[in-house]
Amino acid sequence: MGNGNSTETKESRRSKMRKKIQNFRSRRRLSRPGSGSVSGLASQRSVSADDFAGIALLTLIGAEMKFKDKWLACVSFGEQTFRSEISDSTEKPIWNSEKKLLLEKNGPSLARISVFETNRLLKNNIVGYCELDLLDFVVQEPDSTCKSFDLLDPASSNVVGSMFVSCSVEDPVETETCFAKRILSIVDYDEDGKLSFSEFSDLMNAFGNVVAANKKEELFKAADLNGDGVVTIDELAALLAVQQEQEPIINSCPVCGEALQLDKLNAMIHMTLCFDEGTGNQMTGGFLTDRQASYGWMFKLSEWTHLSTYDVGLNTGSSASHIVVIDRKTKRLVEELIDSKIVMSMRAIYQSKIGLRLMDQGAKEILQNLSEKQGKKMNSVESAQNIPSFLEFFKDQINMAEVKYPLDHFKTFNEFFVRELKPGARPIACMDQDDVAVSAADCRLMAFQSVDDSTRFWIKGRKFSIKGLLGNDVQSDAFLDGSLVIFRLAPQDYHRFHSPVSGVIEKFVNVSGSLYTVNPIAVNSKYCNVFTENKRTIVIISTAEFGKVAFVAIGATMVGSISFVRQEGDHVKKGDELGYFSFGGSTVICVFEKDSIKIDEDLLANSARSLETLVTVGMQLGVSFPKLENCVLEP
């Protein structure tokens, strides 16, 4: 279901998977004749449960809902989303829609299925979702067919229906054999199931590798294990397996022409999908997120008239009307909700020279006054009336089941906005290891090993600098060439921030300033310097593992106050609460000293694409570099 499994359950599944994969390897050894170098090397290859790769055929059979409507189902997997057809008006929609999904090494395995009630003119509304780990289907019995999953209300985790799916995962041996059959069929002109030398030569040419094309005779002899002058399916499979591991011979897909990476199994699976998309009722693809896939035709028309586009990365102009981030847990793309009127006003102010002139002519004061008035309004008893509409707008992004108190506990909107979570809702990674830093907030995160990387990939303000960020009252020399992590909190996020490291709070430094938005539209603008001009508080934390860490809490539009629950001299453990932001979006920036932290590779890779990563408090951020004085030379 994707709602968290126990360690025992995960280990049990992983143990079963290892056994099954060992069986795959045994079958490979038994099915390939001879003891020559090619087959011998092929049998030595290993596939582990951690880097399993294959093809999953996922079929959305139907659902049982609690009321009648016309229903639409979307499958989000990694950076792709697919949608079914819209059903008839019924409580029991039937789709029978299928899609082959690529299970890559170290890639996503969690698929999210979202069910929407459709609306002809307005946007479609999500009613329920379920999550399933496709690796679970690797260990199921071959006769397993349809499985039922509870559909959960995204706002409360209540069960709102049932989803019926089937899934089969093609094992590596089967993928290898089927791939060889499809490859062979391209040039098997006489359709005898074997390749002559001339047919084999044409195949090498189709692979787009000049070196391999010049070694056709040598490769043909290596493939023809029994010396009968032709290459069979098994012999071709063995050759492709070994050569892709030793010296790749496939540079481009012979079907679509796309250049392929060196990973042999992923390249093979890519080509298999190109050969055979399946014969059933196929889901429609080409979407990044389930929200994009679920839009009705009128909404699509409005998107077209505004010339806005969907894409990941650093977007400006009309492309900035959608913010797409990647969920670290599920490895799928998620669209961040933001009102279109707000988008247009932010673009006008922050991404134009006219907006810059407005800033110089009093707009800063207007934003300041607006934020103060809004802060007072959100502290009034009347503001509690806004909570239900706020929850409805962010229906699939706020889970009230995690909140410590029920909804009627909150007497003002700000009380709800700074809500606490239940104990254990945010587990802290490696709690007993102080050399592991963790995420400071539920946020959209950008991480850079150096400040230069941050200005190249993300921060476009012309005057951004560490000295400007930390101000004159903080000794910034140690941080100048350090690592930078940006935690951007959207309005729907849990707005309490926590310590990313264990240490002692040395001091607090308040820096007055403006209240620009911290939305990427402003951060990516070359016309203003959000982080160095906004109101902020700098906390210096002294640690044994990371040296000094500068924790910068930055206010933003509508954020009238930054509150702290700790004092100078307090010792904090990583994951301990430091404070909270009142209503609005806001940001925390952590600056580490140079060479003090090795940030996790997935966070750096996403940030290099200008793609924010959706994380929660306590997720691992990175580990400290070993200090030279602590190293012991072995004799």
Swiss-Prot record:
Enzyme Commission number(s) from the entry: 4.1.1.65
Gene3D superfamilies: C2 domain, EF-hand
Binding site for Ca(2+) 2: D224, N226, D228, E235
Tissue distribution: Expressed in roots, leaves, stems and flowers.
Recorded metabolic or biological pathway in which this protein acts: Phospholipid metabolism; phosphatidylethanolamine biosynthesis; phosphatidylethanolamine from CDP-diacylglycerol: step 2/2
Biased composition (Basic residues): 15-31
GO CC field: cytosol; endoplasmic reticulum; endoplasmic reticulum membrane
Site (Cleavage (non-hydrolytic)): G585, S586
Active site, UniProt feature: D442 (charge relay system), H498 (charge relay system), S586 (charge relay system), S586 (schiff-base intermediate with substrate)
Lipidation (N-myristoyl glycine): G2
Co-factor remark: Binds 1 pyruvoyl group covalently per subunit.
Region ranges (Disordered): 1-42
Entry's localization field: Endoplasmic reticulum membrane
Membrane topology: Lipid-anchor
Keyword list, A-Z: Calcium, Decarboxylase, Endoplasmic reticulum, Lipid biosynthesis, Lipid metabolism, Lipoprotein, Lyase, Membrane, Metal-binding, Myristate, Phospholipid biosynthesis, Phospholipid metabolism, Pyruvate, Repeat, Zymogen
PTM info: Is synthesized initially as an inactive proenzyme. Formation of the active enzyme involves a self-maturation process in which the active site pyruvoyl group is generated from an internal serine residue via an autocatalytic post-translational modification. Two non-identical subunits are generated from the proenzyme in this reaction, and the pyruvate is formed at the N-terminus of the alpha chain, which is derived from the carboxyl end of the proenzyme.
Transcription regulation recorded as keyword: no
Binding site for Ca(2+) 1: D188, D190, D192, K194, E199
Calcium among keywords: yes
Catalyzed reactions: a 1,2-diacyl-sn-glycero-3-phospho-L-serine + H(+) = a 1,2-diacyl-sn-glycero-3-phosphoethanolamine + CO2
InterPro entries cross-referenced by the UniProt entry: C2_dom (IPR000008), C2_domain_sf (IPR035892), EF-hand-dom_pair (IPR011992), EF_Hand_1_Ca_BS (IPR018247), EF_hand_dom (IPR002048), PS_Dcarbxylase (IPR003817), PSD-B (IPR033177), PSD_type2_pro (IPR033179)
Role according to the record: Catalyzes the formation of phosphatidylethanolamine (PtdEtn) from phosphatidylserine (PtdSer). Plays a central role in phospholipid metabolism and in the interorganelle trafficking of phosphatidylserine. Contributes only to a minor proportion of PtdEtn production.
Stated family: Belongs to the phosphatidylserine decarboxylase family. PSD-B subfamily. Eukaryotic type II sub-subfamily.
Assembly mode: Heterodimer of a large membrane-associated beta subunit and a small pyruvoyl-containing alpha subunit.
Domain writeup: The C2 domains have an essential, but non-catalytic function. They may facilitate interactions with other proteins and are required for lipid transport function.
Protein name: Phosphatidylserine decarboxylase proenzyme 3
The organism of origin for this protein: Arabidopsis thaliana (Mouse-ear cress)
